[in-house]
């Protein structure tokens, strides 16, 4: 079941709300691949004929999630970032971004605006807040030493 919590809309994965297309990619955690992930996800969403603003929203949210995996999940090592994008009949997209990196010790605290484990970087601490502002639902699960999974759900407007 997919729930767009901000707008109170629930979409169940049934015949009426089935996945109409899906893509999975794996990328090394190199900073150059942040733009690749952003472009692939936005291009895949184009089949729903979204507005330019909706595409920009997807790009920003994906960029933040992938950057978190690169910078915080893997830090100074190279690992794999797993991305799965599902498009549903009801003009809903679900993007799962997963790493097998360091994990987050306290997810609730990490989701607070301006919280960062990288105090030297003045632009840190807003990633989850940015994702939440551009998506209907953002889910985060993590285990220290096992990695983090971020699910972004966005409903596109009717055209």
Predicted regions and their residues:
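STAS-typified acidic loop motif
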Residues: 24-36
